[in-house]
């Protein structure tokens, strides 16, 4: 059976679960958190080109090069959101972005300065 290298792995989910339980002020609410996230994702309609073009806040788009959000899709968003910036983290999936502090933190500092 073929699997996509762009989708989160079982290890990604295990790491996410462990981090939530370790860092959350309410680690016992994890199942409720997952339920709410699932409901939110099920209702996700996305944004139209017109809605993206109306964004006025400074915007930094961050994806991994192995993210399920493709570089092409992120580049389209970059073109649509005025003045936005795009960072593509190497050898990184969607769920691994926050684990790349070595790359992410300097970018965020520059963006927020």
Describe the residue ranges of each PLM region.
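Short, glycine/charged-enriched secondary-structure capping and boundary segments
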Residues: 1-3, 74-78, 101-104
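Conserved alpha/beta-hydrolase "acid-adjacent" motif
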Residues: 68-73
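Flexible "cap/lid" loop of the alpha/beta hydrolase fold
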Residues: 1-18
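Alpha-helical elements of Rossmann-like donor-binding domains used by nucleotide-donor carbohydrate transfer enzymes
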Residues: 15, 19, 32, 36-39, ...
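Short, conserved loop/helix-junction motifs that constitute active-site signature segments
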Residues: 52-56, 79-81
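Hydrophobic, aromatic-rich cap/lid helix
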Residues: 23-49, 66
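Catalytic active-site module of serine/aspartate enzymes centered on a nucleophile-bearing elbow/loop
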Residues: 84-113
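Short beta-strand/loop motif that positions the catalytic acidic residue
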Residues: 54-55, 61-63
